[in-house]
Amino acid sequence: KIPLEKSLESFQQERIPHKEWMKVQALLKGEFVRRCENVLSFGNPGTGKTHLLCAIGQELIREGYRVRFYSCNLLVQELLRAKKELRMERLFKKLSRLDVLIVDDIGYVQQSREEMEVLFTLLAQRYERGSLMITSNLPFSQWDQIFKDPMTTAAAIDRVIHHSVIIELNLKSYRMEEAQKQQKKEKQSDGNMVVSDGDSQQVSAGHSSPDGQFEETLCDG
């Protein structure tokens, strides 16, 4: 299922280039789904790839489209089980009912050749029959790490890139930015505590006069 917290409202659109945000606005109309086109989101970890595609997915669901979210690793394991249990055709039939299949983090976890073969079979099965929305930390030039051999890699890229929209999020990690902000706040807080301690020491070095005025205590040395 799509994580509900990854919505369009909670996505920080100011972080991404205007050109990429215009692509998102066009995707929200859903025309790419009717044309069975794909959406590919590339970028470093923590740049909002998953959040963005989940947000688009939620908007498409509101428009009546059938959308399903999978992490790549869990999807591959489900495909592999179906293959071993001789029910691949049934699983593909089930997935074919979806208008959009979101596959998150292709290439994040290294898979065996057999696992990647079932993933390739899925890509081939959905080609021009239903939309895929894919996130990956790896650019196409490194997809041979996923599909293991040049021919399969080229065929996989050909199927997903044909009729596709590519969103590039070459940004600084959002999580890293948040961690740095928190660290900065903590340093500022520590600095304020030091100032406060100094103030309290000055106050403790004096006493109040009977009329309420603060007087400094002088000690003869």
Question: Could you say what each language-model-derived stretch is?
Answer:
Residues 8-28:
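N-terminal pre-Walker A segment at the start of P-loop NTPase domains
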Residues 28-36:
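Phosphate-binding P-loop
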Residues 39-43:
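Hydrophobic anchor at the beta1->P-loop junction of P-loop NTPases
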Residues 46:
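Walker A (P-loop) phosphate-binding loop of P-loop NTPases
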Residues 49:
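Conserved lysine of the Walker
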Residues 52, 56:
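Hydrophobic positions on the alpha1 helix immediately C-terminal to the Walker A/P-loop
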